[in-house]
Amino acid sequence: TSEIAQELADKYIKGLLGYSYTPSDPIPFVDVDGSPLGYIVPVVTSNRAAGYLVLDASDDEILTGYRFGDGLVSPMDRGGDLGVESYSFNNPVVMINPFEFGVQSLDGSITTNCGRTIPAVSIEGRPVVLSNKPSSWNDVVIYATQMQDYTVSGFRSISQFMSYDESEIKRLTAHYACMVTAFSNVAELYGIANLYSDPSQYMQIWNYTNTHALSDEEQTVPGVVLGGTPISTCATGFTNYCASRGSTLIARTVSSPAIASIQNEINSNRPNVLHASLYNGSAHSVTAEAYATLTGKKTGETRQMIGIADGWNSSLSFLKYDQSYYAWTYGTTFSK
């Protein structure tokens, strides 16, 4: 019940933040099949928004996510029209994944707090097969529109999710490089740069990391310069960029990071940038900001996954991080 959710939230809040913070009215949410799951509980202090908790009764941990910060509102207070007045008993809040919630419309589509509209056909139950010999990144990434096929447990994340959308990067800068985008997420998370207020910072990161334009044959997007970044110089370059912005953030890159080390960084509220190549030579960089165990509803198969900003979408995706899938992997960590 909402009363129990508020009592639980109050205990969590007092333990995490102190007695000056209190829970507001819990907002119930369901899964994509309409089954009740839990509550989003906004947090306030001095009548000002200060974050929220996600309580999921289907998870053994109950508290499956939280974000705190001055003025930080709950997911249902974001996204323009997607506010508390948008949902009702007949149009409940739906959890797409632990970072993304939405409201189902009469046509069956879901509008989410990430500004996406998921067509009804995209949320019908359909199996997602992850190849053990992936030839495409679609074989190793589970996107938000596929999350209805999985049960999520043991979800952990950094305190705030950040993911620049590829189309927005191209619109703002007329450039795109996956590693520069991943580092831009990190710069935003640490308060070093915001591309919406100053898009030129993307090119600053581009230049500091020695990102270069791809060959003419690889330039496939009219009006947009596509780039590649050498792993050997990315950490030093990003560290120097941060210093130019007055930040003491230091980046370090290591080869073949274990999943446990990635999880430890996330537990310490620090994002990672992961770099990997499939055996066909397709390389990509993503920002690791969460992790969870996903169980296929139809297959029963359980997988340990890394929650990522995938460089293409604004919503959370999950990456199958199995070293045997990749020709090589590197990880960039951050410290002050």
Question: Where are the predicted features?
Answer:
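Predominantly the structural core of cysteine protease catalytic domains
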Residues: Y176, S184-N185, A213-L294, K298-E301
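Exposed beta-strand-loop-beta-strand "reactive/processing" segments of non-cytosolic proteins
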Residues: L16-S58, V94-I110
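Active-site signature of cysteine proteases
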Residues: D60, R78-G108, I259-A260, N267, ...
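Active-site-adjacent structural segments surrounding the nucleophilic cysteine of cysteine proteases
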Residues: Q6, D10-T22, G65-G102, L106-G227
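A short, sequence-level motif marking secondary-structure junctions
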Residues: D56-D60, G115-P119, I123-R126, Y291, ...
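Generic structural motif
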Residues: S20-P26, Y87-V93, S247-V254, G331
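Residue-level detector of short, conserved catalytic/binding motifs and their immediate flanks
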Residues: Y39, G51-L53, Y176, V286, ...
